[in-house]
């Protein structure tokens, strides 16, 4: 029963992340949506790892690696957003096309 609840939670978080990724024009919101997608994957790893074999912690270890990668991705993404904001004075995704002036 708990696996069903966790899978529904992960699917809803994933759908919220996809919706935010598709509809948002703000780069910060897009970055937050990507983090939601990664968190949904983490929930799935932990849920299936606990369901299949509760003694082994492979799912939790993979989840920690994903969180580490997500933290690095967020830091690099925010640094890029800050650099582009200083140049363009906006965080709108339409203004990031560097081929147009």
Curated annotation (Swiss-Prot):
InterPro entries: NADH_UbQ_OxRdtase_chain4L/K (IPR001133), NUOK/Mnh_C1-like (IPR039428). It catalyses: a plastoquinone + NADH + (n+1) H(+)(in) = a plastoquinol + NAD(+) + n H(+)(out); a plastoquinone + NADPH + (n+1) H(+)(in) = a plastoquinol + NADP(+) + n H(+)(out). One of its GO terms (biological process) is ATP synthesis coupled electron transport. Pfam families: Oxidored_q2. The chain crosses the membrane at residues 2-22, 32-52, 64-84. Its EC number is 7.1.1.-. GO terms for molecular function: oxidoreductase activity, acting on NAD(P)H, quinone or similar compound as acceptor; quinone binding. One of its GO terms (cellular component) is NADH dehydrogenase complex. It is a multi-pass membrane protein. It is found in: Plastid, Chloroplast thylakoid membrane. Keywords: Chloroplast, Membrane, NAD, NADP, Plastid, Plastoquinone, Quinone, Thylakoid, Translocase, Transmembrane, Transmembrane helix, Transport. NDH shuttles electrons from NAD(P)H:plastoquinone, via FMN and iron-sulfur (Fe-S) centers, to quinones in the photosynthetic chain and possibly in a chloroplast respiratory chain. The immediate electron acceptor for the enzyme in this species is believed to be plastoquinone. Couples the redox reaction to proton translocation, and thus conserves the redox energy in a proton gradient. NDH is composed of at least 16 different subunits, 5 of which are encoded in the nucleus. NCBIfam families: PRK05715.1-2, PRK05715.1-3, PRK05715.1-4, PRK05715.1-5. Belongs to the complex I subunit 4L family. This is NAD(P)H-quinone oxidoreductase subunit 4L, chloroplastic. It comes from Chlorokybus atmophyticus.
């Amino acid at each position: 029963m708990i696996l069903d609840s966790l899978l529904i939670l992960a699917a809803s978080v994933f759908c919220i992340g996809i919706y935010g990724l598709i509809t948002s024009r703000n780069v910060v919101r897009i970055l937050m949506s990507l983090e939601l997608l990664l968190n949904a994957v983490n929930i799935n790893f932990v849920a299936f790892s606990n369901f299949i074999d509760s003694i082994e912690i492979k799912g939790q270890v993979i989840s920690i690696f994903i969180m580490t990668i997500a933290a690095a991705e967020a830091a690099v993404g925010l640094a890029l957003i800050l650099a582009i904001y200083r140049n363009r004075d906006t965080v709108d995704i339409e203004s990031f096309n560097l081929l147009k002036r």
